[in-house]
Amino acid sequence: MSFRPQNSFHLPLLLLAAATLVTASPAASHAQGKAMAPMSPELQAARAALAKYSDPIVAVRDGYFSTVACIDFPKGATDGPIVYPPGAMGVHFLNTANIGPVLDPAKPQILIYEPVGDKLVLTAAEWFMPEQVANGKAPSIFGQTLAGPMDGHEPIMPPTLRHYDLHVWLWKTNPRGMFTSTNSAVKCKKSAAYTVALGEHHH
């Protein structure tokens, strides 16, 4: 599916960013079930720079806005050549001001939180670039090439928002690896109004 020309990606992103904010108590650093895998100095620096966002209110103050839904793939999913193992992502907070042709380790476009009790706990960051901005070349960061291009992930973005992305689980161990999109250790409450369980096939 082709992406709209010019700067049309701004409108859906801004509409997405204007979504109702999730009300949550500030969250402390998430205790891990097991030790985190060793991180490169670059990843350690990114984790330290983003630690302030363990409080989601600080994230909102700095321009991140909740997309509300807790994204879960209980049976895994496929999206063309991209495979999502069984697991969840969580609640995405998007900062449209960070979208551009250069990826900054200290300025991810998306922060990801897990609902735990009555709080949101920071678990991961996501580097995201619309296909139009990437200008035909898959971007990379932390020695990893972003997955894509792929259609926008409904229901939190329009399918016309084709993009590249990379999830990095900086604060919660991912049994399948730090750069795997879904995390089997992350849980979305099945009874919660805003939990979105996606089926075996994304599209």
Please describe what each predicted stretch is.
Residues 12-23:
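Bacterial N-terminal signal peptides
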